[in-house]
Amino acid sequence: MAFLKIDNVAIRGLAACAPVTIEENADLPVFEEGEAERVINQTGIVRKHVVPPGTTALDLCKAAMEKLLEDLKWEKDSIDVLIFVSTTFDHIIPPNSCILQGMLE
């Protein structure tokens, strides 16, 4: 089993990016009359952020990374470790983490 150890690690910042477009679940055309309210009450999900067609999780993460680097006034080549967390993948191969790492070069 392989292990990775990185000494002297510190978290200096954390970033996330959410799309600006918001879709109200009550307005979705998939629900019949009264059904939207029932689903919203059961799930607690009233609205969601929606990306434009063709936008990927990687696009959002890249925007968050660039904003964080700008706010911290860091150069891309000063990053030793990048942690990428997502519940979705945009490509089978290569994974988003490798693509994002390549964007740092």
Give the ranges of each region predicted by the language model.
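Conserved "HGTGT" condensation-loop signature of ketosynthase/thiolase-family condensing enzymes
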Residues: 1-83, 102-105
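Active-site-proximal gating segment of KS-fold condensing enzymes and close homologs
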Residues: 83-105
